[in-house]
A protein has these predicted regions:
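Small-residue (primarily alanine) positions within well-ordered alpha-helices
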Residues: 11, 15-18, 28, 54, ...
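Short beta-strand scaffold segments in enzyme catalytic cores
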Residues: 26-34
């Protein structure tokens, strides 16, 4: 197993933790000198904060660990392509390399909709590696949303049958 796969597996475990909490299953880790120094998973629902994305959580923890906002010698591993907010945080943190699993066709800020991390107009550019455990990442997400749709259908049927009385 490559080190990239090893770190992405940790991110997937964090994504699973998010799923168990009813959060969109995205996980992220920041690695420094072959050690995980920051972990995060989506907490938007539990924190009721639009900023509580996995990447932001992991970057914040890593910055606290290093006592520096500059994460110049770190790598970020995330199960889903970062959005534009998280891409901005990656640039601001000066992270030089990002690995992600699945593309995000609705909100991707790295490849799908925008290429923010490689925009020459910014003062920092990031090397991007995509597709690490992409199938596993995508399946975790699609399974989560499938469960939500099934619960919504069941709830709708129950409310409709209750209204017929």
């Amino acid at each position: 197993m490559t080190r990239e796969t090893e770190y992405m597996k940790i991110a997937l475990e964090l994504a699973e933790k998010a799923r168990e909490m009813g959060e969109v299953p995205v996980g992220a880790v920041v690695v420094f000198e072959n050690r995980v120094i920051g972990k995060g998973f989506n907490k938007r629902e539990s924190a009721q904060s639009p900023l509580s994305h996995a990447e932001i959580e992991a970057i914040t923890e890593a910055a606290a660990y290093l006592r520096s906002w500059r994460l110049e010698d770190c790598e970020l591993y995330v199960t889903l392509e970062p959005c534009i907010m998280c891409s901005g945080a990656i640039v601001q943190a000066r992270i030089p390399k990002v690995y992600f699993g699945a593309r995000d066709p609705k909100a991707g800020g790295v490849r799908s909709l925008y290429t923010l991390l490689e925009d020459e107009r910014l003062n920092h550019r990031v090397e991007v590696v995509e597709g690490i455990l992409a199938e596993e990442s995508a399946e975790l997400l699609s399974g989560f949303f499938r469960e939500i749709r099934e619960k919504q259908k069941l709830s709708k049927k129950q409310s409709e049958s209750g209204n017929l009385e």
